[in-house]
Amino acid sequence: MREVISIHVGQGGIQVGNACWELFCLEHGIQPDGQMPSDKTIGGGDDAFNTFFSETGAGKHVPRAVFLDLEPTVIDEVRTGTYRQLFHPEQLISGKEDAANNFARGHYTIGKEIVDLCLDRIRKLADNCTGLQGFLVFNSVGGGTGSGLGSLLLERLSVDYGKKSKLGFTIYPSPQVSTAVVEPYNSILSTHSLLEHTDVAVMLDNEAIYDICRRNLDIERPTYTNLNRLIAQVISSLTASLRFDGALNVDITEFQTNLVPYPRIHFMLSSYAPIISAEKAYHEQLSVAEITNSAFEPANMMAKCDPRHGKYMACSMMYRGDVVPKDVNASIATIKTKRTIQFVDWCPTGFKVGINYQPPTVVPGGDLAKVMRAVCMISNSTAIAEVFSRLDHKFDLMYAKRAFVHWYVGEGMEEGEFSEAREDLAALEKDYEEVGIETAEGEGEEEGY
């Protein structure tokens, strides 16, 4: 089996996690108490969904996941919520005091005390796997726990499980909507370790997803639940091929191979289509070509970043539902002819396609319409550097005055770490710039397309 362990860190990671597991349970017909009426083999069968769920002798399905937070309130909601019987109590780890939006507290003082317990639980889950494939790590980097404890955990996972791939789903601060003054500090300190210790990081940002909810789903005032359910659809599409059987299945390591041209250039944009409310879907014909086009629409990107300002290095298209390879190839051929969608000249093919026959599932009472087919696109584009330069600018404004720095130093950080992380990000922006530059040899061949 190719098992995957999910790790949800901090409030953002846990709430996205709740939405994901809710959706996975619906997709597999697993009830909130972990029973699965359709599963006839008691004990660990070799079913595809066993990559995400382990089975007990009593026929109960338990997610291979750990939830951790430095303060109890968010995890207590899981402990008392609808799915309280789904998780083993040991999988829900919470501390007593929170990180107070401070990376240093999450990474050094308070995180240090809890991280060994977390690794111990992760070790137990890993021992329960026959062939662990890797980790999915969910966190947001604006706060203290997701950024500090999240990066501490990634560093320790690299030591303990060096060769296993780590995919991060990371919620980055939005350009306009802010939840903390020190977001730029936390996210840059955290990205510094995401650079080294994740293999692929999918960037999400709340503002972009708010706008999608408003525009496509007519939700006037989207809540975090609306946002998280949308994120859950993306994550579900990415992992569908691990959990179901299909024509072109995609492994976690395959993402890496196809999307990451250089180790540092691994921050991905994602989009999902069709995002449409039930009232509208009734009147629309959502063909493969249409959903493929909307996946490339800048407005449908899940991070505030315009892919028209950069070039694509690689795209991975994960289709699910009623889709055949012939339609996909035709749609992609059309995309390639469009002048607005540019690829770097050193990567002529640029597409990785996965097809899974399991149609998308929607949460009852949710916002999304039930559709026959959907696509999720994960793309590596040089435009993502916009996100970093925006954060770097905000970081510089504050750091020039050393504002708020004493809170970090007081928790045992050194001021040098700020400049080190900032330099690392400056280098990253430079890397993205260089990747997008035309290669010298390519200049004479422009006409030959």
Swiss-Prot record:
GO biological process: microtubule-based process
Post-translational modification N6-acetyllysine, affected residues: K40
Matching CDD domains: alpha_tubulin
One Pfam match: Tubulin
Post-translational changes noted in the entry: Undergoes a tyrosination/detyrosination cycle, the cyclic removal and re-addition of a C-terminal tyrosine residue by the enzymes tubulin tyrosine carboxypeptidase (TTCP) and tubulin tyrosine ligase (TTL), respectively. Some glutamate residues at the C-terminus are either polyglutamylated or polyglycylated. These 2 modifications occur exclusively on glutamate residues and result in either polyglutamate or polyglycine chains on the gamma-carboxyl group. Both modifications can coexist on the same protein on adjacent residues, and lowering polyglycylation levels increases polyglutamylation, and reciprocally. The precise function of such modifications is still unclear but they regulate the assembly and dynamics of axonemal microtubules.
Chain positions recorded as GTP binding sites: Q11, E71, S140, G144, T145, T179, N206, N228
Gene Ontology cellular-component annotations: cytoplasm; microtubule
Cell location: Cytoplasm, Cytoskeleton
Residue positions of the active site: E254
Main location as per UniProt: cytoplasm
Broad EC category: hydrolase
Lineage top rank: taxon: Eukaryota
Binding site for Mg(2+): E71
Entry annotated with the keyword Transmembrane: no
Catalytic activity: GTP + H2O = GDP + phosphate + H(+)
GO molecular function, one term: GTP binding
Site (Involved in polymerization): Y449
Alphabetized UniProt keyword annotations: Acetylation, Cytoplasm, Cytoskeleton, GTP-binding, Hydrolase, Magnesium, Metal-binding, Microtubule, Nucleotide-binding
Catalytic activity, EC: 3.6.5.-
Cofactor annotation: Mg(2+)
Subunit structure: Dimer of alpha and beta chains. A typical microtubule is a hollow water-filled tube with an outer diameter of 25 nm and an inner diameter of 15 nM. Alpha-beta heterodimers associate head-to-tail to form protofilaments running lengthwise along the microtubule wall with the beta-tubulin subunit facing the microtubule plus end conferring a structural polarity. Microtubules usually have 13 protofilaments but different protofilament numbers can be found in some organisms and specialized cells.
Protein role: Tubulin is the major constituent of microtubules, a cylinder consisting of laterally associated linear protofilaments composed of alpha- and beta-tubulin heterodimers. Microtubules grow by the addition of GTP-tubulin dimers to the microtubule end, where a stabilizing cap forms. Below the cap, tubulin dimers are in GDP-bound state, owing to GTPase activity of alpha-tubulin.
Family, per entry: Belongs to the tubulin family.
Full protein name: Tubulin alpha chain
Species of provenance: Tetrahymena thermophila
